[in-house]
């Protein structure tokens, strides 16, 4: 048993000298593993007389338990020290400023659409929507643009087949509203429209807002007053406005609306091509043929319509010189409009 006591003393001394958990594991294998020194002592019991085996076996088991307990205690100490060191390294100073959250913002086109809708709903207009995949009748025929009409050349249209297409304006929403509702009608129709055109001032997909008012006794003065007030509120400036005679198949008389250049205050600059004026929208009195085709008697009811591009107004309001910037998804650009 002197040999057993020496092995235990040797094991305990090795445990005390160990500096990490890896060394402790090596000591465990050395003394308690399958081929460990204390395990080998246990295997010598077979050489002892039968009456001595229980006593010696108990001594060996006691020795193994002592070594195991000291090993486990030492290992627990290392684990606690390691945990404390990690906690100290990962300690959070609660007095430091928190990590700020980067807040998003509405897209400038969305802001522009909301601004337009807010004005018109405030004066009693409703919001109307319709399908973006439209039929030829509602996109052209019902708007006084028959198949042979030269005005169709004004629209570079995306066709699916001879009858179905991507709408080129939101005017079909007005037609569908007139077909399903009785006057008085006061609506604005915001939405995406599609034309085969792409350059610095055009996109194959863009946003348009068209308005329609149908009632008794409506005249061009009502249209003029509505548009002038809208432009004043939208740009938050007292801008000069002019109406130039123009042509649209679905309105008569028709006009283009110009405003005094917001960049140079009418003095003339590169943006307005030295004219002092910027075109912002088209308008006119609803053509009698359009009213008739929608089931409304033009002898009893009159109306006006107008249409504007949201991107065009956004470019003027925010001073953007390239329409494509709105759709490039560049956060450096979009973050300016929070």
Swiss-Prot record:
Location relative to the cell: Cytoplasm
Enzyme Commission (EC) number: 6.1.1.20
Regions annotated as coiled coil: none
GO cellular-component term (any): cytoplasm
Top EC class of this enzyme: ligase
Cofactor note text: Binds 2 magnesium ions per tetramer.
Superkingdom of source: Bacteria
Catalytic activity: tRNA(Phe) + L-phenylalanine + ATP = L-phenylalanyl-tRNA(Phe) + AMP + diphosphate + H(+)
Cofactor(s) this protein cannot do without: Mg(2+)
Protein keywords: Aminoacyl-tRNA synthetase, ATP-binding, Cytoplasm, Ligase, Magnesium, Metal-binding, Nucleotide-binding, Protein biosynthesis
GO biological process per UniProt: phenylalanyl-tRNA aminoacylation
Primary location: cytoplasm
GO molecular function, one term: phenylalanine-tRNA ligase activity
UniProt: Mg(2+) binding residues: 252
Complex and partners: Tetramer of two alpha and two beta subunits.
Similarity comment: Belongs to the class-II aminoacyl-tRNA synthetase family. Phe-tRNA synthetase alpha subunit type 1 subfamily.
HAMAP family named in the record: Phe_tRNA_synth_alpha1 (MF_00281)
Entry protein name: Phenylalanine--tRNA ligase alpha subunit
Provenance organism: Pseudomonas entomophila (strain L48)
Taxonomic lineage of the native organism: Bacteria, Pseudomonadati, Pseudomonadota, Gammaproteobacteria, Pseudomonadales
């Amino acid at each position: 048993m002197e040999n057993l006591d020496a092995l235990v003393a040797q094991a305990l001394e090795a445990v005390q000298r160990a500096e990490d958990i890896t060394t402790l594991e090596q000591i465990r294998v050395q003394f308690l593993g399958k081929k460990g020194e204390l395990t080998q002592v246990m295997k010598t019991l077979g050489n002892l007389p039968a009456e001595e085996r229980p006593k010696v076996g108990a001594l060996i088991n006691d020795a193994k338990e002592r070594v195991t307990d000291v090993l486990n205690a030492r290992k627990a100490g290392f684990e606690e020290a390691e945990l404390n060191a990690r906690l100290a390294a990962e300690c959070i100073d609660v007095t430091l400023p928190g990590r700020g959250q980067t807040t998003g913002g509405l897209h400038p086109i969305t802001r522009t659409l909301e601004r337009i809708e807010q004005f018109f709903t405030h004066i009693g207009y409703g919001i109307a929507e319709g399908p973006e995949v439209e039929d030829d009748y509602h996109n052209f025929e019902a708007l006084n643009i028959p198949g042979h009409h030269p005005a169709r050349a004004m629209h570079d249209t995306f066709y699916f087949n001879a009858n179905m297409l991507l709408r080129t304006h939101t005017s079909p929403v007005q037609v569908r509203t007139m077909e399903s509702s009785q006057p008085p009608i006061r609506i604005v129709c915001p939405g995406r429209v599609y034309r085969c055109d792409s350059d610095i001032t055009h996109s194959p997909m863009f946003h348009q807002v068209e308005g329609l008012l149908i009632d008794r006794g409506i005249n061009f003065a009502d249209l003029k007053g509505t548009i002038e007030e809208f432009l004043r509120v939208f740009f938050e400036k007292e801008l000069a406005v002019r109406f130039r005679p123009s042509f649209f198949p679905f309105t008569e008389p028709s006009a283009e609306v110009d405003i005094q250049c917001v960049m140079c205050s009418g003095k003339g600059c590169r943006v307005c091509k030295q004219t002092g004026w910027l075109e912002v929208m088209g308008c006119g009195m609803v053509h009698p043929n359009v009213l008739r085709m929608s089931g409304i008697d033009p002898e009893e009811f009159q109306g006006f319509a107008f249409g504007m591009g949201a991107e065009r107004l956004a470019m003027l309001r925010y001073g953007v010189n390239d329409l494509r910037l709105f759709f490039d998804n560049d956060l450096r650009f979009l973050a300016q409009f929070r």
